[in-house]
Curated annotation (Swiss-Prot):
GO MF term list: structural constituent of ribosome
Record's protein name: Large ribosomal subunit protein bL19
Species in which this protein is naturally found: Listeria welshimeri serovar 6b (strain ATCC 35897 / DSM 20650 / CCUG 15529 / CIP 8149 / NCTC 11857 / SLCC 5334 / V8)
Cellular component, GO annotation: cytosolic large ribosomal subunit
Gene (name only): rplS
InterPro entries registered for this protein in UniProt: Ribosomal_bL19, Ribosomal_bL19_CS, Ribosomal_bL19_sf, Translation_prot_SH3-like_sf
Length: 114
C-alpha cells in the first residue's frame, strides 16, 4: 500500500521548485481566484519555516506590510503557485525562525550569504 501511495504522489510533485531554506528571501507568485477571474498575487518575504516531506511539504513566508507582520503558509508542490523566485540567500543557524516575530526594524535583518 505504501508503494502505491508513493507512486501516486510522485506524479504530483512539482519539478520546478528551486532550492530554498529558512532565512532566504523569496517572491511567491500565487494564483488567486476572485469570483470568475484568476490573477497572480505577489508575496515577498523571509522564509521562517519549512516542514513536511513529499507532497505535504509546506513553507511559511513572513513580511512586514504597513508595520504589521503578515505570515502566509504555502504548500511547496501546489499548482496554485505560478512561480517561486529566490531573491537572496540568508545565513541563519536555526531551522525555525520564530524569533523574528519579536524583532523590529534593523534587528529583524538576516545576514546574506555572499
Amino acid at each position: 500500500m505504501n508503494k502505491l501511495i508513493d507512486e501516486i504522489t510522485k506524479g504530483q510533485l512539482n519539478p520546478d521548485v528551486p532550492s530554498f531554506r529558512p532565512g532566504d528571501t523569496v517572491r511567491v507568485h500565487a494564483k488567486v481566484v476572485e469570483g470568475t477571474r484568476e490573477r497572480i498575487q505577489l508575496f515577498e518575504g523571509v522564509v521562517i519555516k519549512r516542514r513536511g516531506a513529499g507532497i505535504s511539504e509546506t513553507f511559511t513566508v513572513r513580511k512586514i506590510s504597513n508595520s504589521v507582520g503578515v505570515e502566509r503558509t504555502f504548500p511547496v508542490h501546489t499548482p496554485r503557485i505560478a512561480k517561486l523566485e529566490v531573491i537572496r540567500r540568508g545565513k541563519v543557524r536555526r531551522a525555525k525562525l520564530y524569533y523574528l516575530r519579536n524583532l523590529r526594524g534593523k534587528a529583524a535583518r538576516i545576514k546574506e550569504i555572499r
